[in-house]
């Protein structure tokens, strides 16, 4: 059996493919790329309210189908997908409160997927909160500016997650 030698291991970083691509010559300078992206977002904002209305209607339709049959995984996945899209796009567009509500609603849907009880009152509360958050009075607010609402929504997530069955091994 060979004896091991004492010594320090040589640790060296290895660039990921993304890091290699980011450092390659050519391309667009970072600041110019960010300016271009922001300009594109600003161009999309006038049509955003129409998009948001359409997405909320789609989410409401999906949620109605989940309410009709909470055990249907395909219907639940469609609702979850609509909610995730709402969360992601609203985050990009700067609608922090809508993003917060949609993110918490995604957690509720995750809990239902994990076996938590479907509670129509919780779902209605989240849909009402989304409708309120998209109004002119609430649109530009951050979650910390409406603590009563956000604390209540967080509490509902905690209860939903706690009600999901846990795998005991």
Predicted feature residues:
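Residue-level signal for short amphipathic helical patches enriched in basic/charged
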Residues: 47, 93-96, 137-140
């Amino acid at each position: 059996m060979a004896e091991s030698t004492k010594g320090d291991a040589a640790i060296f970083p290895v660039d990921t493919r993304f890091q290699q691509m980011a450092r390659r010559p050519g391309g667009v300078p970072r600041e110019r790329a960010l300016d271009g992206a922001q300009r594109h977002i600003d161009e999309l904002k006038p049509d955003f309210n129409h998009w948001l209305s359409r997405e909320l209607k789609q989410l409401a339709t999906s949620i109605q189908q989940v309410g009709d049959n909470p055990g249907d995984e395909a219907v639940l996945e469609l609702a979850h997908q609509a909610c995730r899209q709402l969360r992601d796009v609203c985050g990009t567009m700067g609608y922090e409160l809508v993003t917060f509500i949609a993110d918490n609603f995604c957690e509720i849907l995750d809990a239902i997927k994990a076996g938590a009880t479907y509670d129509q009152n919780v779902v209605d509360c989240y849909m009402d909160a989304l409708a309120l958050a998209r109004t002119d009075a609430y649109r530009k607010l951050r979650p910390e500016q409406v603590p009563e609402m956000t604390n209540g929504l967080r509490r509902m997530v905690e209860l939903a997650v706690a009600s999901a069955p846990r795998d005991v091994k």
